[in-house]
């Protein structure tokens, strides 16, 4: 038996450590920031107490610009009329329900989209976070949700109208609080005969093209920027979910002006449900789809029965109509949430992990290994085999001699 000698220690060279100052903007500590849900999406690594104030300032300035533009347009109408031009009164119902009036109204409300994007960028540096936690619009959810919402709302609205009529309840008209007499000529199914007003083709085109933008503008402002702005002040998750939902729901309902309790409740429930959809899908897409489908159906029916002015200026609904509308809204939202969750949408913002900030200071020279200890297949002097076999034998080892550390 031969004496075993430990293998010679071979010093390894030490790689130089990068030194110097970090590139501008690289302030990460190397750890992954905690994932954030949509209401707290703006509480990212760059969040500071003053950043929400910047976003608020941009929003106020934007609203001031929009208001000023509207006032200038009204002033232009007044000046043109004083010079003898025959123009419709911009404050009249006739102008409101005209193609030009609907175009101005819808595009004015659609300005909520760029306003929310600009305010979000000013506050967090990522404008797309107001659309979804991925920082972009998820078009599959938006377009698919719009189709599902339209199918649901048409089916439920027509179905309940027929059902209520068969049960002896009024279906629209003066009894429905719209101020029209269409219900007096309703047929046995509860579906009114179509009586579109003149110019309905141009009006339908304007509504079809701009109503989705109008609905998106309201959602981007209320459920988007305003919800995230409130959530950026709140550290606790459940408060950041509940408080923005309640506040924006109330403001959304109040923004529609004077209204009866049932109409206010209907709009409040819609706002609360939209906030739930945004939270549980991680973005605005499903809420925008439900809002756009609801308005497209409402405006489409109003044009078909020449009741667009009554639909836009509605201030009250009877309890039955309000309760039915709330039930349809809740059922539609529940189905949309189920459909969206089947697509497994992202629910949290994930920030990229940045490397550790680089140390500043002189660069240390690399440690050099001595020449006599350089690794190689042959070491100086006689080599005595180790009694410990390697983890994996080289090819042919079994033929060269005993294995598993056996000696003879």
Where are these regions (language model features)?
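Membrane-embedded alpha-helical segments of transport systems
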Residues: 61-66, 111, 150-151, 293-298
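N-terminal, membrane-interfacial amphipathic/helix-forming hydrophobic leader that caps
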Residues: 1-125, 131, 315-408
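Membrane interfacial helix motifs at helix-loop boundaries and amphipathic/re-entrant anchors
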Residues: 70-105, 158-200, 254-263, 303-323
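Transmembrane helix-loop-helix hairpins at the membrane interface
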Residues: 203-337, 341-357
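Hydrophobic residues within the alpha-helical transmembrane core of Major Facilitator Superfamily
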Residues: 57, 159, 250-251
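Cytoplasmic juxtamembrane regions at transmembrane-helix boundaries
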Residues: 122-143, 223-238, 243, 357-365
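Residue-level signature of transmembrane alpha-helical entry/exit and packing/kink sites
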Residues: 51-55, 98-109, 141, 145, ...
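Juxtamembrane helix-loop-helix connectors linking adjacent transmembrane helices
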Residues: 103-106, 129-216, 227-228, 232-233, ...
């Amino acid at each position: 038996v031969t004496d075993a000698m430990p293998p010679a220690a071979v010093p390894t060279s030490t790689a130089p450590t990068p030194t110097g100052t970090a590139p501008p903007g690289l302030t990460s500590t190397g750890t992954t920031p905690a994932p954030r849900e949509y209401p707290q999406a703006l509480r990212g690594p760059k969040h500071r107490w003053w950043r929400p104030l910047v976003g608020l300032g941009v929003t106020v300035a934007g609203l001031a610009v929009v208001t000023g533009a509207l006032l200038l347009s009204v002033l232009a109408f007044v000046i043109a009329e004083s010079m003898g031009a025959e123009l419709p009164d911009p404050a009249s119902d006739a102008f409101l329900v005209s193609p030009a009036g609907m175009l101005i109204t819808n595009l004015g409300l659609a300005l909520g989209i760029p306003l929310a994007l600009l305010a979000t960028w000013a506050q967090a540096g990522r404008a797309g976070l107001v659309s979804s936690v991925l920082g972009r619009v998820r078009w599959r959810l938006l377009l698919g949700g719009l189709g599902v919402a339209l199918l649901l709302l048409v089916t439920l609205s027509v179905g309940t109208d027929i059902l209520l009529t068969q049960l002896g309840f009024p279906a629209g008209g003066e009894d429905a609080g719209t101020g029209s007499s269409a219900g007096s000529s309703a047929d046995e199914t509860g579906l009114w005969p179509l009586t579109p007003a003149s110019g309905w083709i141009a009006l339908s085109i304007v509504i079809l093209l701009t109503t989705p933008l109008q609905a998106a503008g309201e959602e981007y402002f209320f459920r988007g920027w305003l919800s995230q702005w409130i959530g950026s002040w709140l550290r606790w998750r459940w408060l950041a979910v509940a408080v923005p939902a309640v506040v924006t729901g109330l403001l959304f309902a109040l923004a529609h002006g004077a209204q009866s309790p049932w109409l206010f409740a209907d709009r409040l429930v819609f706002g609360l449900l939209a906030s739930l959809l945004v939270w549980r899908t991680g973005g605005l897409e499903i809420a925008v789809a439900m809002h756009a489908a609801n308005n497209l159906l409402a405006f489409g029916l109003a044009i078909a029965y020449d009741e667009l002015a009554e639909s836009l200026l509605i201030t009250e609904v009877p309890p039955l109509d309000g309760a039915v509308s709330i039930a349809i809204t809740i059922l539609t939202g529940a189905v949309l949430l189920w459909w969206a969750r089947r697509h497994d949408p992202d629910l949290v913002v994930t920030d990229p992990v940045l490397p550790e900030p680089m140390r500043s200071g002189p660069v240390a020279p690399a440690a050099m290994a001595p020449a006599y200890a350089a690794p190689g297949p042959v070491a100086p002097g006689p080599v005595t085999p180790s009694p410990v076999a390697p983890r994996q034998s080289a090819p042919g080892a079994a033929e060269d001699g005993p294995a598993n550390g056996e000696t003879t």
